[in-house]
């Protein structure tokens, strides 16, 4: 067996990635989210596959096909709600995973970090298109509003929007192509995740102290396999509590109303995991400016490695940076809250201030505080 696992081309890759991988001895539970994201992805692909067996991507029947899944298909309701709430769990793990990377300086592995940003965009695109498929009110109007943002692109904007729609409005062609893309993207995400892992295993994992751990490595199995299984059990517990007790907690009631192009919902808003970006988009009165801010709110992560001015890698021993990091987390929570509120007096100003603070922390305060901490080390 030992000979086979070290010689067989396929077994060698699997064993070197999940069994014999040298891992730092001090990585905390914050390093569990990579495996949890893998589990979420597998879960989403499997539940999605079973949903696709019964779903019809036609404007006339899409809404009723989802109803049919919930009412008539054996355990269809649990598959549907596991898929919908699985997306929420996916994003919770994603945000915590990115937050861990920011806190502990994992962005100092630029290849892994940049593939991660591409993965984030791909998952966001997949989730957006998936939200359109049930063809409820929020599906239709969400698709209309978000795709319409592309019309802000100079010269080609309007043509681009009509090209994406496949007509002059969000209609049958749009739904069909969104279903096709929603089906294929998770497999592209799987391939990207494999590349993400490939780059990570070139350098080895970071650890909480930020100090190279080459002299102190332990095998991944059994130490971290058992740790990952514990994390997975906790993830499944939370997901199943959500699915079985309050499956609609994170959804929008408007999506139980079939799509009607003649009736606009009072408040158009995306799923909760996009609200922070939606708040940044709305905080800028100009359409093109808003779209740029929306894209840059995620793309800003790509320039974080260039703005690293500290002599230490992580924030474990940098209390000033820690304060700033948690201020950023609080700011993102405020943005998420604002994204779900109507566009009226106090919320507009709060949203604009929170958006300015978001970019200011990442682009201005973090590098400056790091320089101050470097100077404090000299005393």
Curated annotation (Swiss-Prot):
Organism, scientific name: Martes flavigula
Pfam families given in the database record: Cytochrom_B_C, Cytochrome_B
Binding site for heme b b562: 83, 182
Gene: MT-CYB
Name the UniProt record assigns to this protein: Cytochrome b
GO biological process: mitochondrial electron transport, ubiquinol to cytochrome c
Cysteine disulfide links: none
Binding residues for heme b b566: 97, 196
SUPFAM superfamilies xref list: a domain/subunit of cytochrome bc1 complex (Ubiquinol-cytochrome c reductase), Transmembrane di-heme cytochromes
Alphabetic keyword roster: Electron transport, Heme, Iron, Membrane, Metal-binding, Mitochondrion, Mitochondrion inner membrane, Respiratory chain, Transmembrane, Transmembrane helix, Transport, Ubiquinone
Annotated Gene Ontology cellular component terms: mitochondrial inner membrane; respiratory chain complex III
Co-factor note (free text): Binds 2 heme b groups non-covalently.
